[in-house]
C-alpha cells in the first residue's frame, strides 16, 4: 500500500497551522509512521444554492498557514496531497450543492456561475500545490449534487492540469464510485470509504473483515474497468459504541465510548486492503490541529482522533510493516 496517510487540519481557523499547538499536533501525527499527509481545509459559499465561493480574511486558513504545514511535512520526507474543500455557511452538506439545469432561455446560468467560481478557487490552490511540490492534488470532496455535470468537471480537470503537473483525484462518497462518469480523466479513483461494516455495536474484527471483503471485491471490479487505482481519500470512525455501523457519524455525542470497536474497524480494513496491488492507499480521517497529550485525556474523547487510543497502535503496526516492505524491495 503506497499511501499510508492521514488527513490533517480540517476546519482549522486562520493561524492554526502556524501555532505551537498546531505544530505539536502535526509532529505527533508524523510520529505514527505516515508517509503521506492530506492537508484539508475549507472555504465557504453562503448557502448551498450560492454561486460564489468567498475567502474570509478573518477566519479562513491563509497561504502562510498552508506553506507552514507543507514545509513541516517535507522536512520529515512526508508527501503531501493538497485538498481544498468547499463548505456551506448555512450548515448544509456540500453534497446538496445543486442548481436547475437551465432557465427559460435554455441557459445553464447558475451552473456556469458556480463552476466559474469553483474553478478559480481550485486554480489558486493548484498553483500552490505546484509551487510547493505537493505530490497530489484533490479537486473536490463529496459534491454529489454536482457530479452529474460531466462536461463542467472535465473542463475543471483540464484547467487544473494546465497549472498542476502531478497526479490529481476527486473524492466521491462511498457507494457512488461507479456513478462518477469522468473518473477516467483522473489519476486515482478517490472515495470517502465510510462503509458500514457492522449492524450494531460490539461487532468483532472478523465480522468486519467479512464485510470489507465484499466491498473490496466490488471496488476491484471498478479499478480494473477504469484501469485506475482506488484511493480512500477519507475513512475512519469514532471511538464510540456502534461506530462501525455508521462510520461517518460525528453527531451522536451521547454514545458510549468504545476504543475496541474503533480499533477493529481500522484493523479489519487494513487487513483486507493492505496487500492489494490495485489499491493505492488510505488517508484516515482525521487528525485535529489541536490534540490532547495523554491517555487519560484520550479517555474523554469519543471523536475520530486515534491519538493515545488502541487504533493508534493498529496504525503504527501496519504503517511500520509498509515501511519495512518498501525498504526490503529497494
Q: Which positions does each model-derived feature cover?
A:
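Aromatic- and acidic-residue-enriched segments that line the glycan-binding/catalytic groove
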Residues: 57-58, 89-112, 186, 250-251, ...
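The substrate-binding groove and active-site-proximal loops of carbohydrate-active enzymes
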Residues: 9-16, 50-63, 104-117, 140-147, ...
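Aromatic-rich peripheral "rim/lid" segments of glycoside hydrolase catalytic domains that contact
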Residues: 16-17, 247, 263-268, 272, ...
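Short, acidic/polar
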Residues: 15-30, 115-128, 173-182, 263-272
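Glycoside hydrolase catalytic-domain groove-lining segments
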Residues: 62-63, 68, 76, 83, ...
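Active-site neighborhood of glycoside hydrolase catalytic domains
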Residues: 121, 136, 146-170
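Substrate-binding cleft and catalytic face of glycoside hydrolase catalytic domains
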Residues: 35-51, 65-146, 287-290
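Aromatic- and glycine-enriched glycan-recognition loops and surfaces
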Residues: 14-31, 54-75, 120
Amino acid at each position: 500500500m503506497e499511501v499510508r496517510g492521514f488527513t490533517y487540519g480540517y476546519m482549522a481557523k486562520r493561524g492554526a497551522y502556524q501555532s505551537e499547538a498546531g505544530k505539536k499536533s502535526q509532529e505527533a501525527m508524523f510520529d505514527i509512521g505516515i508517509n503521506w499527509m492530506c492537508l484539508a481545509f475549507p472555504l465557504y459559499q453562503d448557502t448551498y444554492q450560492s454561486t460564489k465561493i468567498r475567502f474570509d480574511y478573518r477566519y479562513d486558513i491563509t497561504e502562510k498557514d498552508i506553506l507552514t504545514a507543507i514545509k513541516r511535512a517535507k522536512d520529515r520526507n512526508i508527501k503531501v496531497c493538497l485538498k481544498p474543500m468547499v463548505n456551506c455557511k448555512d450548515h448544509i452538506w456540500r453534497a446538496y450543492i445543486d442548481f436547475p439545469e437551465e432557465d427559460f432561455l435554455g441557459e445553464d446560468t447558475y451552473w456556469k456561475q458556480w463552476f466559474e467560481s469553483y474553478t478559480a478557487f481550485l486554480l489558486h490552490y493548484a498553483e500552490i500545490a505546484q509551487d510547493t511540490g505537493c505530490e497530489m492534488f484533490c479537486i473536490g470532496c463529496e459534491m454529489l449534487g454536482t457530479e452529474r455535470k460531466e462536461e463542467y468537471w472535465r473542463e475543471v480537470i483540464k484547467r487544473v492540469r494546465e497549472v498542476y503537473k502531478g497526479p490529481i483525484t476527486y473524492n466521491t462518497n462511498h457507494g457512488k464510485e461507479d456513478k462518477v462518469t469522468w473518473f477516467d480523466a483522473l489519476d486515482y479513483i478517490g472515495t470517502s470509504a465510510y462503509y458500514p461494516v457492522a449492524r450494531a455495536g460490539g461487532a468483532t474484527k472478523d465480522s468486519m473483515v467479512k464485510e470489507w471483503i465484499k466491498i473490496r471485491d466490488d471496488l476491484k471490479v471498478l479499478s480494473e474497468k477504469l484501469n485506475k487505482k482506488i484511493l480512500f481519500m477519507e475513512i475512519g470512525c469514532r471511538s464510540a459504541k456502534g461506530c462501525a455501523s455508521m462510520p461517518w457519524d460525528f453527531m451522536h455525542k451521547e454514545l458510549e465510548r468504545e476504543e475496541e470497536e474503533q480499533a477493529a474497524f481500522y484493523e479489519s480494513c487494513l487487513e483486507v486492503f493492505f496487500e492489494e496491488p490495485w489499491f493505492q492507499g488510505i488517508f484516515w480521517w482525521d487528525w485535529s490541529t489541536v490534540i490532547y497529550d495523554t491517555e487519560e485525556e484520550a479517555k474523554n474523547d469519543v471523536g475520530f482522533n486515534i491519538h493515545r487510543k488502541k487504533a493508534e497502535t493498529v496504525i503504527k503496526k501496519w504503517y511500520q510493516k509498509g515501511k519495512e516492505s518498501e525498504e526490503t524491495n529497494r
